[in-house]
Amino acid sequence: MNRRYFLFPKVSGEYLITCYQQIDGNQYAALYTETLTIKLQNEFLPFLYPNQYVDFSSKSEACKLAASLVKEDMTDIDILKTFYTYVTSHISYDYDKADFVEAGYLPDVDDTLSTGTGICFDYAALTTAMLRSQDIPCKLQIGYSGDVKHAWIDVYIRG
Protein backbone atom coordinates (compact mmCIF):
# COMPACT_ATOMS: atom_id res chain seq x y z
CA MET A 1 0.00 0.00 0.00
CA ASN A 2 1.36 3.42 -0.96
CA ARG A 3 0.73 5.70 2.01
CA ARG A 4 0.21 9.36 1.19
CA TYR A 5 -0.27 12.11 3.74
CA PHE A 6 -2.13 15.33 3.21
CA LEU A 7 -2.03 18.17 5.68
CA PHE A 8 -5.55 18.01 7.03
CA PRO A 9 -6.42 19.23 9.51
CA LYS A 10 -3.74 21.58 10.77
CA VAL A 11 -5.42 22.27 14.08
CA SER A 12 -8.17 20.93 16.30
CA GLY A 13 -11.62 22.15 15.33
CA GLU A 14 -14.77 21.43 13.38
CA TYR A 15 -14.42 20.61 9.66
CA LEU A 16 -17.07 20.29 6.97
CA ILE A 17 -16.23 17.62 4.38
CA THR A 18 -18.17 17.51 1.11
CA CYS A 19 -17.67 15.13 -1.83
CA TYR A 20 -18.82 16.40 -5.21
CA GLN A 21 -19.54 14.68 -8.51
CA GLN A 22 -19.02 16.44 -11.82
CA ILE A 23 -22.36 16.81 -13.60
CA ASP A 24 -21.31 18.71 -16.72
CA GLY A 25 -18.38 21.00 -17.54
CA ASN A 26 -17.76 23.04 -14.39
CA GLN A 27 -21.03 22.06 -12.69
CA TYR A 28 -20.90 19.78 -9.65
CA ALA A 29 -23.44 18.26 -7.27
CA ALA A 30 -22.81 17.40 -3.62
CA LEU A 31 -22.91 13.63 -3.09
CA TYR A 32 -22.00 13.48 0.58
CA THR A 33 -21.49 15.97 3.39
CA GLU A 34 -20.14 15.27 6.86
CA THR A 35 -19.06 17.48 9.74
CA LEU A 36 -16.06 16.18 11.68
CA THR A 37 -14.86 17.37 15.06
CA ILE A 38 -11.11 16.90 15.30
CA LYS A 39 -9.15 16.97 18.55
CA LEU A 40 -5.45 16.48 17.96
CA GLN A 41 -3.66 14.65 20.76
CA ASN A 42 -0.43 16.43 19.83
CA GLU A 43 -0.58 19.89 18.23
CA PHE A 44 2.76 19.28 16.49
CA LEU A 45 1.76 15.98 14.84
CA PRO A 46 0.81 17.55 11.47
CA PHE A 47 4.30 19.05 11.29
CA LEU A 48 6.13 15.71 11.56
CA TYR A 49 4.75 13.94 8.48
CA PRO A 50 5.05 14.34 4.72
CA ASN A 51 2.32 16.15 2.81
CA GLN A 52 1.69 17.55 -0.66
CA TYR A 53 4.18 20.40 -0.12
CA VAL A 54 6.87 18.41 1.69
CA ASP A 55 6.83 14.97 0.08
CA PHE A 56 9.41 12.54 1.45
CA SER A 57 9.82 9.02 2.81
CA SER A 58 12.47 7.24 4.85
CA LYS A 59 14.02 6.22 1.49
CA SER A 60 14.32 9.83 0.29
CA GLU A 61 17.83 11.13 -0.30
CA ALA A 62 16.88 14.13 1.83
CA CYS A 63 16.20 11.85 4.82
CA LYS A 64 19.39 9.86 4.24
CA LEU A 65 21.36 13.10 4.11
CA ALA A 66 19.69 14.36 7.29
CA ALA A 67 20.57 11.15 9.13
CA SER A 68 24.20 11.39 7.96
CA LEU A 69 24.55 14.97 9.23
CA VAL A 70 23.15 14.33 12.72
CA LYS A 71 25.49 13.30 15.52
CA GLU A 72 24.30 11.60 18.71
CA ASP A 73 25.00 14.51 21.08
CA MET A 74 23.32 17.20 18.93
CA THR A 75 20.42 19.26 20.30
CA ASP A 76 17.48 20.28 18.12
CA ILE A 77 19.09 23.73 17.73
CA ASP A 78 22.36 22.10 16.63
CA ILE A 79 20.48 20.01 14.07
CA LEU A 80 18.60 23.05 12.77
CA LYS A 81 21.84 25.03 12.39
CA THR A 82 23.53 22.09 10.64
CA PHE A 83 20.67 21.61 8.17
CA TYR A 84 20.38 25.35 7.52
CA THR A 85 24.11 25.62 6.85
CA TYR A 86 24.06 22.59 4.56
CA VAL A 87 21.07 23.72 2.50
CA THR A 88 22.18 27.33 2.14
CA SER A 89 25.73 26.34 1.17
CA HIS A 90 24.84 23.46 -1.21
CA ILE A 91 21.73 24.77 -2.98
CA SER A 92 21.98 27.72 -5.37
CA TYR A 93 19.05 30.02 -5.99
CA ASP A 94 17.51 29.39 -9.42
CA TYR A 95 16.49 32.81 -10.72
CA ASP A 96 15.17 31.41 -14.01
CA LYS A 97 12.90 29.01 -12.16
CA ALA A 98 11.69 31.86 -9.96
CA ASP A 99 10.82 33.93 -13.03
CA PHE A 100 8.88 31.14 -14.74
CA VAL A 101 7.43 29.00 -11.93
CA GLU A 102 3.78 28.19 -12.60
CA ALA A 103 0.79 28.13 -10.28
CA GLY A 104 0.41 24.72 -8.66
CA TYR A 105 4.16 24.07 -8.50
CA LEU A 106 5.14 21.51 -5.85
CA PRO A 107 8.73 20.98 -4.72
CA ASP A 108 10.60 17.69 -5.12
CA VAL A 109 13.08 17.58 -2.23
CA ASP A 110 15.29 14.93 -3.83
CA ASP A 111 15.36 16.82 -7.14
CA THR A 112 16.45 19.94 -5.27
CA LEU A 113 19.32 17.94 -3.75
CA SER A 114 20.38 16.33 -7.03
CA THR A 115 20.27 19.54 -9.10
CA GLY A 116 21.69 21.69 -6.32
CA THR A 117 19.28 24.47 -7.30
CA GLY A 118 15.90 25.75 -6.21
CA ILE A 119 13.68 28.63 -5.25
CA CYS A 120 12.61 29.58 -1.73
CA PHE A 121 9.81 26.97 -1.84
CA ASP A 122 12.42 24.27 -2.63
CA TYR A 123 14.76 25.44 0.14
CA ALA A 124 11.89 25.44 2.65
CA ALA A 125 10.55 22.04 1.56
CA LEU A 126 13.99 20.41 1.68
CA THR A 127 14.81 21.80 5.11
CA THR A 128 11.35 20.85 6.39
CA ALA A 129 11.72 17.26 5.14
CA MET A 130 15.14 16.96 6.77
CA LEU A 131 13.88 18.32 10.10
CA ARG A 132 10.71 16.21 10.11
CA SER A 133 12.76 13.10 9.35
CA GLN A 134 14.57 13.78 12.65
CA ASP A 135 11.27 14.21 14.57
CA ILE A 136 11.63 17.98 14.78
CA PRO A 137 8.26 19.59 14.04
CA CYS A 138 8.50 22.05 11.18
CA LYS A 139 5.79 24.02 9.40
CA LEU A 140 6.30 25.24 5.85
CA GLN A 141 4.71 28.65 5.36
CA ILE A 142 3.71 30.25 2.06
CA GLY A 143 2.93 33.93 1.85
CA TYR A 144 4.36 37.23 0.72
CA SER A 145 7.45 39.27 1.49
CA GLY A 146 6.22 42.67 0.41
CA ASP A 147 4.62 41.98 -2.96
CA VAL A 148 6.76 38.92 -3.77
CA LYS A 149 5.47 35.39 -3.09
CA HIS A 150 7.75 33.63 -0.62
CA ALA A 151 8.13 30.41 1.40
CA TRP A 152 9.78 29.96 4.80
CA ILE A 153 9.66 27.62 7.78
CA ASP A 154 8.59 27.70 11.42
CA VAL A 155 10.53 25.23 13.57
CA TYR A 156 9.24 24.05 16.93
CA ILE A 157 12.17 23.45 19.27
CA ARG A 158 11.78 21.33 22.41
CA GLY A 159 12.89 22.77 25.69
Predicted feature descriptions by range:
Residues 75, 119-123:
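Short, contiguous, pocket-lining structural segments
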